[in-house]
Each structure stands twice: as C-alpha cells, then as structure tokens.
Amino acid sequence: MRTLLALLLLAVVASSASAQTPRPGSVEELKQLSIEELVDTDVTSASRRIERLADVAAAITVISAEDLRRSGATTLPQALRLAGHLDVARVSGPQYAVSARGFSISTENKMLVLIDGRTVYSPVFAGVFWETQDVFIQDIERIEVTRGPGGSVWGANAVNGVINVITKKAAATRGTLVDIAAGTSTLGPYGVRHGGRLTNAISYRAYTKVRFEDSHQLVSGADAKDDFDFGQAGFRIESEQAEGSIAFVQGDVYTGTTGMASGTEANLSGGNLLARWSQTYGDHMSTVQAYYDHTYRRVPVQYRGVLNTFDLDAQHQWKAGRQNWVFGAGYRRYDGDDLGDGPGFYFEPRERTSHRLNVFVQNEVHVAGGFFVTAGSKFERNEFTGFEVQPTVRARWSAQRHSVWGAVSRAVRVPTRFDTDLRFRAPGSTTGALLLTGNSEFESENVVAYEAGYRQQLRERISIDLAGYVNNYDDLRTQEFRPGEPVLLANMMNALTRGIESAATAQLADWWQVHVAHAYLWKELTFDPGSRDLTNGRSEANDPRNIFKVRSYVNATNRIEVDAFFRFYGERPSPVVEAYHELDARLGYRLRPGWDLSVIANNLLHERHVEYRAGTAPETYERSVSLRSAWRF
C-alpha cells in the first residue's frame, strides 16, 4: 500500500511539473565545486568565527549542499557517511553510532553535535538519538565536521570532535520544493517546503516531511521488528538589515514510533524553538542566541522520560590590528524527569535539574608573515564535578598554497545521569537486587590531545589534507565488579590512541571529480590498579583500525549525473564484526529546469551485511533501490 501511494505521488508530481514553469533563479544548475571553491569555503566550527577552510588550524571536513544532493542521502547519519574520516555504523533501524578517532559505541558520548548552534546530544547519556535528529536535507547549506577536541570554544563533550549542521538562510529557499522518494525498504521522505518574502528585509520558509522504514532482518533471518515511522514540520523567519543586523527565529516539532525486538513500539516526540541575533559594526561582531528544546521518549517496560532544555549564549568578536579576539559566556538548564515505565531500569533521583555556566576566550595573533598563534580556554561549572578548564594552543603557518598547523588541547566529558543516577535490575524482576548502579562520585573523563596537519593545493586540480594525532585519555568509564554488591560505574580506565588521516580531492577532468579519504587508528587501553572491569574496556569502544572511502562525481552530460560512493570498514574487534566493503550509486537526470529525478542504489556489493553489534543478535542491512523526485517551482 505504501509503495502504491508513493508511485501515485510521483506520477502526480511528474504530470504537474510538466505543466509548470519554474520560478526564475530558483533552480540550481548541475555543477561541481572547483578545487579553488572547496579550499576557499568559509567555516565557523573550529574557532566560532568565520575563516577559510584552508586557514583552519584543525582537522576539518566540509560536506556541501552539492555533496548531499549527489549522495541521495535522506537522513543526517547517511549524510555524515560522506565525511571521509568519520566512523558511521548502523546499529539498528534508525539508530547509528557516529564517532571520530575511536570510542565507537551505540551511545557515543565523545562527540558534540549541533544543528544551527543548538546542542542535540542528550544529557541523560551524552549521546545522540539520531532517529529524532532530522532536517529538510535540501535546506542544509553545509555540515562542518571538526575532528579532535573542541572544548576550548564549545565546552563539555567536544572531546573527539564537533559536528555542526548549518542550514541555509530563509532568503535562499524561496519558492516551493516537493521531495518524494520510494524504495524497496524505505518510503520517503515525502516532503514539501515553501519559502517567500514578507517584506524586502524579512524572508520565511516552512516545511513538513514524513518517512517510513521497513524492519530489517537479524543475522539468523528473523524479523528485527525495528520498523520506523516519523514525521516532522518546521519553520524559519529571518530579517536581514542593511546596517549589518541579522535576526532569525526557527523551530521544529516531530513525532514518531520505532519498533522494538519485543514486538512493542517506542514513542518519540518533541520540539524546539531557537532565536538568534547578530550585529556587525566595523571590526566588531556580536551574537546572542537562545533556544528551548523539549523531548519525550517512552520505551515500554524500560524508560519513560521528559527532558526540557533552556540555553542562552552570547559571544563577541573583535579584530584589533594583528589580534583577533573571540569571547563569550553561556548558561544552560536541564530539567529531566524519569516518569518510569518499568521497575528494571530507572534513575534515582527520579527528577534532576542541572545548571551549567561557562565563559570562554580565544585570541589569534598574527606573529609575522604567514605565521599565526591561537590560544584560549573555556571555563565551565557543572553540578557533578564543579569547575572544568579546557584550554588549547594552536599554531599555523601558511605560504601560497601550503599550510602547516599543530595544536595541544584538553577536553572533558562531564558525568551524565547514566553515570551517576542509573539503577538497573535483572529483566523481569520487580523487587530483585540491583545488578548495576551509577556512582555519585563519578568524575569527568578527559583527554589531552596532540595534533598536527598539512594542507596543499597542487595547481588547480588536486588538493591534499593530512592530519596526525596522539591522544591521552584518563578516567574513562568502567563497570567494576564488587562481590555481593551491584556492579558500579567508575573511572578506572585510561587510553592512548594514535592515528593518521589523509584525504585528497582531484579534478580528473572538467566533468569528473574524485574524493579519497583514509583513517588509521591504533588504540591501547590500560586500567588503574585494583580495577575489576567486567568488560575489559569492550563496552566503551569497538573501532575498526582502517576506514577507506571514495566518492566519484561524473557529469556525463549537461543533464545526466553518474555518482558513486565506495566505503571500506575494517574489522571491529569486540564484539567481532567482520570487515565489510560496500558501494552506493546514483543516476541523476534533469528532466527540465526545476525537476530532478534520481535512481539510487545502496549496498550493491552484498545482499546483506552487518555494520555493528550492540547485542547478541546483530541486524543486517540489505541491498536496496529507490526512486527520488525533487521538483522546484
């Protein structure tokens, strides 16, 4: 029935598009960003100010709107696969593990994820519920992925990296877009977005979208019962004045259900509202942002919780001669209620209100010629460990088309309710003894990272990007066995990681562009004297040693695109997941200005494969084909 509905919708769009004239200026031409355009891209995530990608003293990758369009991605995790050095693994249904530089777990807790400056990780466990982080993909301007610590400007949880999703201005999305897709395993997105102008200075857009995913199979061939239905709607209103003042308000609401192995369904809902104002005057720029976020999540017999977040942040940038200052302050409040949905898994206390305060300062100094030095720190106070300091020192030297950089940084992951308040009984038990408990004395996990990198643009057709790092981690989470008592969460593990990351982009011909990336990770775990960790560190990391990705974009004609994405992931050691390689492909055709049709094939090399193992019965992901139509008018 869903497939029939999708095909009917595609037919309606086709017949309507043939009768419509596209809005002038609303249609992007088939194109590829040149190498020059790629290295000149402006980014903001590394230092919270605008700088050229080629001038950033950090390891950073940008996923452009063009990359997203040509990938056929329909969700954020699918889009993040395009970042060459990110480890993106599908855990179950709509749930993913996303990490950089190690420590991949299904509840990944060392990455900071932002959508238009709004933090989306859960303070319950410091990870991201990826199934509820959705955007209208065509509204994304770019995704900036910074690898390595970002705590000096972004604060806690920016331990191994920062993912910053930045959407387009409202003025850039005028007109109407209808996006419809149907495939062998997924229906959707079915989405509509409309934008316009209220006055010469005020623009707006609004959207709605739904998607439906069928359940997958376990390795045994049994039904995983992880089907997923999700709907979301949102808006943005933006004012841009000639005096350098920009202000916008945007918000989203969503609701969805996801199947469980038990045959029941988890219920998900929430919404957010964000407002930002910025003013540029001479060499100064001020920004103030506030947002409210509400989430509700019910997993039958396990968890039923409500979380409300309020965040206020202000920053100021000041360029004075050879110095470029950025400083600011912020406040965040979390109100979390564990409403209870079963006696086996709960938090004690049931309710907790958390307050976090922070200030940061960073200064880049132009020392001489192409040599720049940046130093700064974030100072935060949280309710679990008190005062935390996260400093960084970075240096960069640039000459013509070469750039060399290095950095030393410290970052922390502060405790969560999972670490301090968790109580867990045996499944099915109502009065039995606790099996696992949080620790009120749980400390912050921390890392001291040493990084270096090199970038070069070879003529106009090739660019290369190299980075290396050594990370020292202390006070990592363990599960300590205690005879006659519940297992206790504690900080008795340490780690040393080393890695090399390389990437290259080549314009092999005017009509053919190729991106290649490789990440190598070496990791060693050690334990404090007296530790009796039950998992021997397995519960905190299960990483492949090698990740290799290739993207190819071909403009076969002025209307036809042929794109491919190959990825290789090495073996995950414990629990073991065999190495796998896969290929996705897309054939795009511009039927007429304003109307694009794509055929997308995923996982072409194997009928089914496993990407991650979070339980005793891992899921498999099958070969699939989908048809997608995007119509702009």
Per-region residue spans from a language model:
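Short, acidic, small-residue-rich periplasmic hinge/interaction motif at the N-terminus
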Residues: 20-69
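Extracytoplasmic beta-strand/coil segments of soluble accessory domains associated
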Residues: 44-61, 77-119, 141
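Short acidic/polar hinge/loop motifs at secondary-structure boundaries
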Residues: 119-147
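Periplasmic-side early beta-strands and strand-to-turn transitions of outer-membrane beta-barrels
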Residues: 151-152, 164, 172-173, 181, ...
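Conserved C-terminal beta-signal and adjacent last beta-strands/turns
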Residues: 195-197, 240, 448, 539-633
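Membrane-embedded beta-barrel scaffold of Gram-negative outer-membrane proteins
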Residues: 287-299, 334-337, 398-399, 403-405, ...
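Gram-negative outer-membrane beta-barrel transporters
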Residues: 366-373, 464-465, 469-472, 490-572
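Surface-exposed extracellular loop regions of Gram-negative outer-membrane beta-barrel proteins
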Residues: 383-385, 397-450, 468-490, 529, ...
